Amino acid sequence: STGPMGEMPNRFETIDESRSNLKKIGLEATARNIAKTWFILGDKAKYFDICIQAGKETSIEAADNALIAIKKWNGIDNLELIKNKTLIIWGDKDKSYNFEQVQTLKKNIPNSSLVIFKGCAHNVHLEKNEEFNKTVLNFLRNGTK
């Protein structure tokens, strides 16, 4: 689950800001700040704590290296090489990936379908899990959204 490029336009903060925060305020506080943007209800979301727990399973060095790798990554030229039917899922309130990123995926991945979940942020699978599961199951069974 990713967008076509690492340095995401209009992300809630730049990759460099995330790296700086990681060093200034530490891993757990940075993870909390980032994970809050993944849910409509922020840190009050039902599954917020599992995101924080996952963040605690890494180190500052590993998190920083991941951010460095993300910043440099660009997969736009490879999207057309995806030959499988592809389901693109996006929450209309996502602060990590804007709609332009999603449109780039849809435009450049042949045989792709786009499903937009209303009232969801980045973690569609956790915010509307039943609807998400039905959508994915239908796609796997029928190849359609």
Where do the model's predicted regions map?
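Active-site acidic short loop of glycosyltransferases
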Residues: 83-84, 111
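Short beta-strand/loop motif that positions the catalytic acidic residue
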Residues: 82, 88-90, 94
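Catalytic active-site module of serine/aspartate enzymes centered on a nucleophile-bearing elbow/loop
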Residues: 112-145
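Hydrophobic "lid"/C-terminal helical patch
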Residues: 34, 67, 105, 132-136, ...
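Conserved alpha/beta-hydrolase "acid-adjacent" motif
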Residues: 95-101
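Conserved alpha/beta-hydrolase catalytic His-Asp/Glu region
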Residues: 7-13, 24-80
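Cofactor-binding loop segments of dinucleotide-utilizing enzymes, especially the Rossmann-like FAD-
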Residues: 2, 91-92, 119
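Active-site nucleophile loop of the alpha/beta-hydrolase fold
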Residues: 1-7
